[in-house]
Regions:
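Short amphipathic alpha-helix
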Residues: 17-28
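Glycine/Thr-rich phosphate-binding loops of Rossmann-like dinucleotide-binding domains
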Residues: 17-18, 45, 108-109, 154
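Glycosyltransferases and closely related glycan-assembly transferases
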Residues: 85-100, 106-122, 135-143
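Conserved nucleotide-sugar phosphate-binding/catalytic loop shared by glycosyltransferases and other
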Residues: 4-12, 31-81, 85, 161-169
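Residue-level detector of alpha-helix initiation sites
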Residues: 14-15, 19, 104-106, 128-132
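Active-site-proximal region of nucleotide-activated glycan assembly enzymes
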Residues: 44, 55, 115-169
Length: 169
C-alpha cells in the first residue's frame, strides 16, 4: 500500500456538501488514511461529522450578503481568524498532507492556509451551479472535480488544466 496520508476535508452548511465529503472520507479511512474535517460545530457538519466517527476541527466563519457588500469585511475578518486557528491546530496536531474542499464558505480558511503553506488541495463541486467558494479557490487547486460536465466551464483558466467530471461521490 502507498503511504498513509493525513487528509483534512472542509465541507459545510448543507447535506449536499457534507454527504459526498463523508462518503469520500469513509473510503479514504477504509484505505488506511487519517481523515479529519474542518467545520462549524453549530452547523450541520457539527453533528454529522462526529456521528460518522471523524474528528472536527472547529472554526467559525460566515458568508457575506452580496446585496450588502460591507458584510464582506466581517466575513474576511472571520476567515483570517479561522485561518489562524487552523494554523495553531495543525501546529499541535500535525499538518495535513493534502486537503479537500467540497464547497461552502467553510472551505476558504482551510484552502487559503494550504495555499500559504504549500499543501496541495483538491476541489469537488457537486451542485448544478458552482459556488463562489470553489470558484475563488480554483486558481490554486491541484485539481477540481465536478459532478456535472457543464460545471467544468466555471473552472476554465483557473488552476490545473485537467479538471475532471466524477459525478457525485
Amino acid at each position: 500500500m502507498a503511504k498513509s496520508l493525513k487528509v483534512t476535508i472542509a465541507a459545510g452548511g448543507t447535506a449536499g456538501h457534507i454527504n459526498p465529503a463523508l462518503a469520500l472520507a469513509e473510503e479514504l479511512r477504509d484505505r488506511g488514511h487519517s481523515v479529519s474535517f474542518v467545520g462549524q460545530t453549530a452547523k450541520l457538519e457539527g453533528r454529522l461529522v462526529p456521528e460518522a466517527g471523524f474528528p472536527l476541527i472547529p472554526i467559525h466563519v460566515q458568508g457575506f450578503d452580496r446585496s450588502r457588500p460591507w458584510t464582506a469585511v466581517q466575513s474576511l475578518a472571520m476567515v483570517l481568524r479561522a485561518k489562524g486557528a487552523l494554523g495553531r491546530a495543525f501546529a499541535e496536531q500535525g499538518a495535513p498532507d493534502v486537503c479537500l474542499g467540497f464547497g461552502a464558505y467553510v472551505e476558504v480558511p482551510l484552502l487559503e492556509w494550504c495555499r500559504k503553506n504549500g499543501v496541495p488541495y483538491l476541489l469537488h463541486e457537486q451542485n448544478s451551479v458552482p459556488g463562489l467558494a470553489n470558484k475563488m479557490c480554483a486558481a490554486h487547486a491541484a485539481r477540481a472535480s465536478c459532478a456535472l460536465p457543464q460545471d467544468l466551464s466555471a473552472f476554465d483558466g483557473k488552476g490545473a488544466a485537467d479538471h475532471v467530471v466524477t459525478g457525485n461521490t
